[in-house]
C-alpha cells in the first residue's frame, strides 16, 4: 500500500516515497543524532581562570617559618578566596562528529514516524501575501495538533512570514530541518514549492 499524505488546503492526497517515509526507525540511531545536534549547538564559551591568570597574589602572604601554619607562596592558589580554579571549565567545542549517511538515514527514520502516524501534510506553498490568518485557516482545515514544524523552500517567502507568528510553530527551510525538530513536532507541514516532487522530501539535500 502506497504511503500518502493529505494535500492540506487542496484536494486529494500526495504519494510519499517509500525510500524516505517507509524506513524502519531505530531508537539508538535517532538518539545519537539528536544528541549530536544538541551538543553542536552548545557555545562552549564557559571559562574559569587558573592561578596563573588571576590578578594579584604576587607577595608571599606570611613568612615561611614560625607561624605554625602551612607554608604559602601566594594568595591566588586554589585554596584561597579569589584564587584560581583547579581543573575548571575552559572554552571548548562540544560538536560531535557523525557519519553523514547515518544522519540522513536518521532523518528519514524521523520522517517515517510522521508518515506512520498520519501527522505529515503537504500544502501548495502559494501565499499571495504574508497573512497569519491564512496560515491559521490552513491549519484549521488540517486539524492536527501542535507543536508544528513547517518546511519551506525560502525563508523569505510569504508562507514563512505567515506561519512564523503562530504559537508552538517553527518554520524551517529544508537545509535547517534536523532530526530533533522532526521528532519535536507533533505535526509536519511541507510546502509543495520545496525543490523535488511534492511530499517526497528526497531532496533533504542528500546531494550535498
Predicted stretch roles:
Residues 1-43, 88-208:
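Extended polybasic, low-complexity segments that bind anionic RNA or targeting/receptor surfaces
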Residues 49-87:
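Glycine/serine-rich anion-binding loops at beta->alpha junctions
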Amino acid at each position: 500500500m502506497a504511503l500518502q499524505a493529505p494535500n492540506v488546503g487542496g484536494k486529494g492526497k500526495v504519494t510519499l516515497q517509500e525510500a524516505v517515509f517507509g524506513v524502519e526507525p531505530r531508537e539508538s540511531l535517532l538518539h545519537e543524532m539528536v544528541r549530536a545536534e544538541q551538543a553542536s549547538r552548545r557555545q562552549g564559551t564557559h571559562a574559569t581562570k587558573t592561578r596563573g591568570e588571576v590578578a594579584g597574589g604576587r607577595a608571599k602572604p606570611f613568612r615561611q617559618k614560625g607561624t605554625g601554619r602551612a607554608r604559602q607562596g601566594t594568595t591566588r592558589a586554589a585554596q584561597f578566596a579569589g584564587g584560581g580554579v583547579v581543573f575548571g571549565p575552559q572554552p571548548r567545542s562540544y560538536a560531535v562528529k557523525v557519519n553523514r549517511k547515518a544522519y540522513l538515514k536518521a532523518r528519514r527514520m524521523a520522517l517515517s514516524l510522521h508518515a506512520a502516524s498520519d501527522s505529515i501534510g503537504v500544502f501548495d506553498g502559494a501565499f499571495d501575501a504574508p497573512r497569519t490568518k491564512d496560515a491559521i485557516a490552513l491549519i484549521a482545515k488540517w486539524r492536527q495538533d501542535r507543536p508544528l514544524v513547517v518546511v519551506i523552500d525560502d525563508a523569505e517567502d510569504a508562507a514563512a512570514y505567515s506561519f512564523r507568528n503562530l504559537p508552538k510553530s517553527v518554520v524551517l527551510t529544508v537545509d535547517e530541518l534536523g532530526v530533533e525538530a522532526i521528532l519535536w513536532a507533533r505535526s509536519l507541514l511541507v510546502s509543495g514549492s520545496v525543490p523535488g516532487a511534492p511530499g517526497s522530501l528526497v531532496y533533504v539535500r542528500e546531494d550535498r
